[in-house]
């Protein structure tokens, strides 16, 4: 986030959380609740509590738990065990009551109106790459996301896959963390690795691996094939 001139601005800490075992409870069954359920169910368990549900919520109920309840009568018990609560009913006063009770219980709250204590960013996910974007202006957030999506070509996805595969080998070949970081930087700065990614993933991988083994690097530069180098190991 970039801080505006407004002195009341409070910066938020960007985090990537493992939500696979953390429950998100959404109060309300309308379009907003549907949108939230579609997002959060990609990451972990979701429960939607409402008197009624949109057709899409009902049609995809294998992705989340639907609980029919008159929230005006009882909502407090559904906050038990929740990690994040999302008050998304059409009743603003009810939403405030849910939020107040959640805060009292130590449950995080994602508001659907206004800025709460949990802000859901705009997310770009391509392969093993995840980028989260947030600004104070939704239009700017969307603009940034579109620009970044244009820049995030398949080569970057290939590089993420390549480095993920190479990382365990680097730990064995290069004991020192600083030396490993230096090797990764040299891979990222190697134009030949990037060029090969567009033609042959395996050749790009062997070229990248050679940064950890100087003798292999010298042989590649001299014209040895990646296949011969692989047999030499």
Please give the residue ranges for each predicted region:
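Glycine/serine-rich phosphate-binding loop and adjoining beta1-alpha1 elements at the start
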Residues: 1-19
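Glycine-rich adenosine-cofactor-binding loop
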Residues: 15-38, 50, 162-172, 176
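Short, hydrophobic beta-strand segments that form beta-sheet elements in well-ordered domains
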Residues: 26, 45-50, 109-111
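NAD(P)-binding Rossmann-fold cofactor-contacting core
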Residues: 35, 43-60
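Short beta-strand and adjoining strand-loop segment in the mid-core
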Residues: 45-47, 82-92, 128-137, 150
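Glycine-rich, highly charged phosphate/nucleotide-binding loops
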Residues: 61-80
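Rossmann-fold NAD(P)-binding glycine/threonine-rich loop
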Residues: 92-136, 140
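An accessory alpha-helical subdomain
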Residues: 135-233
């Amino acid at each position: 986030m970039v801080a505006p001139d407004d002195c009341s601005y409070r910066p938020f800490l960007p985090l990537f959380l493992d939500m696979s075992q953390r429950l998100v409870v959404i109060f309300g069954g309308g379009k907003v609740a549907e949108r939230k359920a579609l997002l959060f169910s990609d990451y972990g368990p979701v429960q939607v509590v409402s008197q009624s549900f949109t057709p899409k919520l009902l049609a995809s109920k294998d992705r989340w738990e639907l609980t029919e309840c008159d929230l005006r009568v009882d909502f407090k018990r559904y906050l038990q065990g929740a990690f994040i609560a999302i008050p998304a009913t059409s009743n603003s006063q009810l939403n405030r009551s849910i939020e107040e009770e959640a805060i009292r219980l130590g449950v995080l709250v994602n508001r659907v109106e206004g800025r709460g204590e949990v802000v859901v960013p705009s997310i770009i996910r391509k392969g093993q790459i995840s980028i989260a974007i947030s600004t104070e202006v939704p239009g700017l957030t969307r603009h940034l996301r579109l620009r970044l999506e244009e820049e995030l070509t398949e080569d970057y996805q290939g590089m993420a896959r390549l480095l993920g595969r190479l990382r365990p080998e680097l730990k064995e070949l290069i004991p020192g963390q600083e030396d490993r970081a230096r090797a990764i930087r040299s891979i990222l700065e190697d134009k030949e690795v990037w060029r090969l990614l567009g033609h042959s993933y395996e050749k790009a991988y062997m070229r990248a691996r050679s940064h950890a083994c100087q003798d292999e690097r010298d042989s590649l530069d001299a014209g040895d094939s990646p296949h011969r180098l692989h047999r030499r190991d």
